[in-house]
């Protein structure tokens, strides 16, 4: 699981200039965002899932809440999160994942908590076997998620890859903050981008002949 910092400076495919990677979606929706991330990581991306984080509580509640491990005590948006293992439901996961300013790691700490939330949903969702549970989840997904996966493909992933949740690796994109013309960017060295791309290709069992389209 890889989180790309939103301020990462890279080429916006289809625009022909460099900008923050999260601007690709604003310029051209999921298609331009996918093209830009594909170019940045040099790997093919066949599917996407766009999540409405403001309504993510519906998905968390549909799986019966989630469990996370919190690194330090903090309060945010009226909620208090103590250090240690926490059970979250309702609007708690969104508040937990959004806090940034009190975290000594800043946006990287927020990215880690966002990955925890996603991992928690995967853990709970993959363990469901009854039709009722699955119907609740699909109902929540239908309201809050946009994807190019078909229903059968979603069912197939839940059925065939649920054990993969026990073997999830998390990677951070290494770089440093910089200012160009007064605007803050996250600059990723070419050697780091190449190393990350190679790692992903190895895990995905793809080679350069596939990525060179």
Give residue ranges: language-model regions:
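Non-catalytic, solvent-exposed segments at the cell envelope interface
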Residues: 1-213
């Amino acid at each position: 699981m890889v989180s790309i910092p939103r301020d990462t400076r890279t080429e916006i495919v289809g625009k022909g200039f460099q900008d923050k990677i999260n601007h690709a979606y604003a310029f051209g929706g999921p298609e331009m965002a996918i093209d830009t991330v594909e170019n940045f990581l040099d790997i093919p991306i066949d599917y996407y899932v766009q999540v409405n984080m403001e309504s993510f509580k519906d998905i968390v509640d549909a799986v019966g809440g989630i469990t996370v491990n919190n690194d330090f005590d903090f309060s945010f948006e009226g909620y208090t999160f103590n250090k240690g293992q926490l059970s979250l439901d309702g609007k708690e996961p969104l508040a937990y994942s959004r806090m940034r300013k009190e975290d000594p790691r800043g946006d990287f700490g927020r990215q880690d908590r966002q990955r925890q939330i996603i991992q928690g949903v995967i853990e709970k969702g993959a363990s469901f076997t009854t039709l009722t549970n699955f119907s609740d989840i699909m109902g929540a997904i239908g309201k809050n998620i946009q994807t190019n996966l078909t229903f059968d493909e979603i069912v197939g992933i839940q059925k065939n890859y649920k054990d993969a949740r026990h073997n999830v690796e998390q990677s951070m994109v290494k770089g440093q903050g910089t200012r160009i013309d007064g605007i803050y960017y996250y600059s990723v060295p070419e050697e780091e981008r190449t190393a990350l791309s190679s790692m992903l290709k190895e895990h995905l069992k793809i080679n350069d002949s596939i990525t060179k389209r």
